[in-house]
Amino acid sequence: MYDYIKGQLTKITAKYIVVEANGLGYMINVANPYSFTDSVNQLVTIYLHQVIREDAHLLFGFHTKDEKDVFLKLISVSGIGPTTALAIVAVDDNEGLVNAIDNSDIKYLMKFPKIGKKTAQQMVLDLAGKFVEAPQETGNTKARSNKAGNTQLDEAIEALLALGYKATELKKIRAFFEGTSETAEQYIKSALKLLMKG
């Protein structure tokens, strides 16, 4: 098992990043790949969780230990796999997640992709009181204005689709942001907040 990787960030896609270490390129699934844009071709440290399946060995990566801790707690819940957990971690307001669990707010939890009533109830049952404190905001929140525009919005929509959000939901998101100029990372952060508001 891996705890973290330190290497050069060489590639960003809508679903994953690639970090090169010791001559090998590691494909790492992350919640918001575009939050790493400022670190391309730079040395990065990514906290890791490895999932071994019969057909694949998958790596899931995180900016911080807190983010990884939230992910690990989520995948301990019956009915939540790593992809769904990653989609939940993608939402900046992890404090909202913790509050919803501790206050048995099933309706809020059901706003996450692939989380139905039964799984939301299981989250409350398994995780209530397990978070000592709400994790800090994750990722790089520094605003960037380069490469803004429709291409950035397209990349954000693609990343949200990869997290499990429905195309019908994202049509409204696209319409909401048309004509604006942000980075893909900023679009994703704003879109996730809108999606959680319903």
Swiss-Prot record:
What InterPro entries would the database entry show? Answer: DNA_helicase_Holl-junc_RuvA_I, Hlx-hairpin-Hlx_DNA-bd_motif, NA-bd_OB-fold, RuvA, RuvA_2-like, RuvA_C, RuvA_C_sf
Supply one GO BP term. DNA recombination
- Stretch list, region Domain III: 148-198
How it assembles, according to the record, is: Homotetramer. Forms an RuvA(8)-RuvB(12)-Holliday junction (HJ) complex. HJ DNA is sandwiched between 2 RuvA tetramers; dsDNA enters through RuvA and exits via RuvB. An RuvB hexamer assembles on each DNA strand where it exits the tetramer. Each RuvB hexamer is contacted by two RuvA subunits (via domain III) on 2 adjacent RuvB subunits; this complex drives branch migration. In the full resolvosome a probable DNA-RuvA(4)-RuvB(12)-RuvC(2) complex forms which resolves the HJ.
Q: Superkingdom, according to UniProt?
A: Bacteria
Q: Which UniProt keywords apply?
A: Cytoplasm, DNA damage, DNA recombination, DNA repair, DNA-binding
From the UniProt entry, list the residue stretches annotated as the region Domain II: 64-142
Annotated compartments? Cytoplasm
What is any one of the record's Gene Ontology cellular component terms?
cytoplasm
Its family remark reads: Belongs to the RuvA family.
**Which region ranges are annotated with the description Flexible linker?**
143-147
Report if keyword Glycoprotein is assigned.
no
Which Gene3D superfamilies would you find in this protein's record?
5' to 3' exonuclease, C-terminal subdomain (1.10.150.20), DNA helicase RuvA subunit, C-terminal domain (1.10.8.10), Nucleic acid-binding proteins (2.40.50.140)
Q: Mostly located where?
A: cytoplasm
Single GO MF annotation:
ATP binding
Query: Pfam families annotated for this entry?
Result: HHH_5 (PF14520), RuvA_C (PF07499), RuvA_N (PF01330)
- Disulfide pairs? none
* Its biological purpose: The RuvA-RuvB-RuvC complex processes Holliday junction (HJ) DNA during genetic recombination and DNA repair, while the RuvA-RuvB complex plays an important role in the rescue of blocked DNA replication forks via replication fork reversal (RFR). RuvA specifically binds to HJ cruciform DNA, conferring on it an open structure. The RuvB hexamer acts as an ATP-dependent pump, pulling dsDNA into and through the RuvAB complex. HJ branch migration allows RuvC to scan DNA until it finds its consensus sequence, where it cleaves and resolves the cruciform DNA.
Read off the NCBIfam families from this record.
ruvA (TIGR00084)
Question: How is this protein named in the record?
Answer: Holliday junction branch migration complex subunit RuvA
Please state what the annotation says regarding this protein's domains.
Answer: Has three domains with a flexible linker between the domains II and III and assumes an 'L' shape. Domain III is highly mobile and contacts RuvB.
Keyword DNA damage set for record: yes
Stretches for region Domain I: 1-63
